[in-house]
Amino acid sequence: MTEMVKAVLNGEFEMMLPKHRADRPEWYEQQGWEKPRLKSMHQNIGKGDVVYYVGAEEGEFPALCQMWGAEVVLFEPNPKVWSHFPATWTANNLELPMVCIPGFASDKINDLSRIYYNEWPPEVNDVIEAAHGFKELYLEGDTYGQITIDSCVYDHGIKPPTAISLDVEGSEWRVLGGAERVLREYKPKIWLSGHPEFMLQQWDESLYNLRQWTKGLGYTETILDYQHEVHLYYESA
């Protein structure tokens, strides 16, 4: 049985987490963990929102989105982290996420993509591992499911996002490129964690060009922070 303990993320957001996550020192340091980004999300997400959380990792931030009143669609390719989700959702008295997608949000679709509506994927039955690493699209895109956000909305009838959060370690343009129709039609708010070095290394792409492309779709940009990555917020102009 996983030990769940109370944590206060960035000195502000209280929730129950598996002990190894609650014990992360970054939550309690003055600079916090992605503090301006999380504060911006808290200020702009609430009841009636549908958040597509791309790169959900172990689930703290999307769980907070749901605690603030939003519905969430989770994208996470790493099978080793899904076991954290039921423990966190149950301990915080949350309803099941609207949709779980154990794969990559991408700019293409493969035959491995799976969608679970109001249920957990089978990956949740694995043992919780504290050290799990990441899955990266450019290396393992053919190993795990890929689906576009546009396909989620227009082919599968999932509620369109009012907000998209993505932290994908270099594959930012793959995600947003696969959401172009949704971005043009619905103008969801976007929290983008940009990794310029990874984008260049993995895809020979420029974060600057992605930023200009996004603004060209009718968005205004706010730079929230730059720590280990640059945190950007976009809203309809």
Report residues per predicted region:
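S-adenosyl-L-methionine
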Residues: 1-148, 154-158, 207-237
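Active-site micro-motifs of SAM-dependent methyltransferase domains
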Residues: 24, 107, 151
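Short internal loop-to-helix segment that lines adenine-nucleotide cofactor pockets
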Residues: 28-52, 111, 129-186, 198, ...
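Short, glycine/acidic-enriched loop or turn micro-motifs at the edges of active sites
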Residues: 56-58, 79, 107, 168-170, ...
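Generic structural signal for helix capping and beta-alpha/helix-loop junctions
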Residues: 82, 108, 199-200, 231
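Conserved beta-strand signature within the Rossmann-like core of class I S-adenosyl-L-methionine
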Residues: 187-194
